[in-house]
């Protein structure tokens, strides 16, 4: 398919059935391959949508500086769009993010301000808000509270899923900013009320890379509990195990947060098998694994070794 710009190539990603990881012939798991977006992650959708809506609203004009707290993917997506549209961008990142993410941000011209590792992305948000107060002419799009984050998925991801798989019964995504869950969830619920919306959420006081537990003190402003059917608890070992299985059994090379979503999808699928139900379960492959090669998680001999290698790194 032909496009005039990488920005025009955002979205319309493949939906792929996973025959080896699906629990049964009647309970099928489908992967929405968001790693096929131009910068390799689902965040291309909200990044572009937030910028374009800010332009329409007159908040973002030529010569403006974009400010965003991020631990990687959203910043990378915003940096790519900012580069093409001619904006300066400043990203506040926790100091313990993977080197690949820092290199990618710098490659697209982003200026990086490091926030303390303690507190992770929550601390990055605080630092960014302080910078915003100091520089009122900077435009902080703020993915955690910007309705255009969820709006991107309501306008694109949700319709794509329903068009490709009218029989969809469940939608599963990792719980981060909650933009994907809120946007897709609202769209699917409006057009197919029986669809179940499932959030893959880390266990309390456990680190699942790329996700957050809502009970640990920071609830994104976008979050609306009424959109979800359930929150599925996932441990770090579960996420790493499923990430490695996805590569080894289905050939999909994804980031660790995707493993958490897959674990929840498999759990939902097993319940459907036990209840003798038919199900088509869609989960989001949020990004590709190539951004995390330096961690060694994919080449470790065992899951335990992979988890040990990940200690101290932030992937949100």
Language-model regions: role of each:
Residues 1-316:
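PLP-dependent amino-acid enzyme catalytic core
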